[in-house]
């Protein structure tokens, strides 16, 4: 399924650039994109500057983050709300991305050493 089908048209309408983070974890790469001054030594800064422009406009640069791990969902929603207040578009999608349609198992290790499994 195309990710545009997962995001509403209004969420990406007006985006000149769209960064797709497939396997976003906690969304740090999106922070590198939108908040480069907080990460001056990030190796991604040069890549983002090259492809999105060093003087990119965060109002027309958008990010779509795919992350299937439910443990990270609340973090992505908080990040989305923070960016929304600034007028920046960050679309977290609670889904995995892959080339094959076969099921996968997501393993989450807790601080107590327990392992939970989520079939996706």
List the model feature ranges, each with a label.
Residues 1-120:
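Phosphate/nucleotide-binding beta-alpha loop and adjacent structural elements of enzyme active sites
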């Amino acid at each position: 399924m195309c990710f545009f089908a997962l995001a509403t048209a209004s969420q990406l309408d007006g985006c000149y650039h769209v960064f797709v983070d497939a396997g976003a974890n906690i969304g740090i790469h999106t922070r590198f994109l939108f908040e480069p001054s907080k990460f001056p030594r990030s190796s991604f800064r040069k890549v983002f500057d090259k492809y999105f422009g060093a003087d990119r406009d965060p109002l027309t640069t958008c990010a779509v983050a795919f992350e299937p791990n439910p443990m990270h969902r609340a973090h992505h929603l908080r990040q989305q709300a923070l960016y929304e207040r600034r007028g920046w578009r960050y679309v977290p999608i609670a889904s995995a991305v892959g080339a094959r349609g076969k099921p996968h198992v997501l393993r989450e290790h807790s601080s107590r050493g327990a392992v939970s499994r989520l079939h996706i």
